[in-house]
């Protein structure tokens, strides 16, 4: 399994609260004070952690699926008028957040 992380920063101060509300409309469960696991189209379960930025963590079976999952998540994150309101930074961290273990 490969850990994938998206750090989402706001270019508009209202963007992150609105984006988080939209993402939580998908089937989700709260797992911490500021954490939810949501099932997003094309990527499966994603850990959402809110704070001064929004962090999305997920696990992917094979490295070959990284571009497919990144494309699906970018499409989900940038839809609904968010294309110019957020900045995304992708990484593959060495550790997996506890709620995803």
Task: Locate each region found by the language model.
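Hydrophobic residues positioned within well-ordered beta-strands of beta-sheet architectures
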Residues: 4-6, 54-56, 88
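Polar/charged, Gly/Pro-rich intrinsically disordered segments
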Residues: 38-43, 93-101
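Short glycine-/aliphatic-rich beta-strand segments at the starts of folded cytosolic domains
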Residues: 1-24
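C-terminal structural segments of small proteins and small subunits
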Residues: 64-96
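Residues that cap or initiate secondary-structure elements
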Residues: 12-14, 44, 62-64, 94-96
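Short, intrinsically disordered low-complexity segments
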Residues: 29-64
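A general secondary-structure signal for short beta-strands and their flanking turns/coil
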Residues: 1-3, 51-53, 83
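Short secondary-structure junctions
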Residues: 26-32, 80-85
């Amino acid at each position: 399994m490969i850990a994938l992380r998206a750090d989402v920063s706001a270019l508009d101060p209202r963007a992150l609260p609105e984006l988080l509300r939209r993402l939580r409309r998908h089937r989700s469960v709260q797992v911490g004070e500021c954490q939810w696991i949501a099932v997003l189209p094309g990527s499966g379960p994603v850990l959402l952690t809110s704070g001064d930025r929004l962090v999305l963590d997920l696990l992917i079976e094979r490295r070959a699926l990284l571009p497919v999952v990144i494309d699906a998540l970018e499409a989900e994150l940038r839809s609904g008028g968010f294309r110019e309101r957020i900045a995304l930074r992708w990484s593959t961290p060495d550790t997996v957040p506890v709620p995803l273990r």
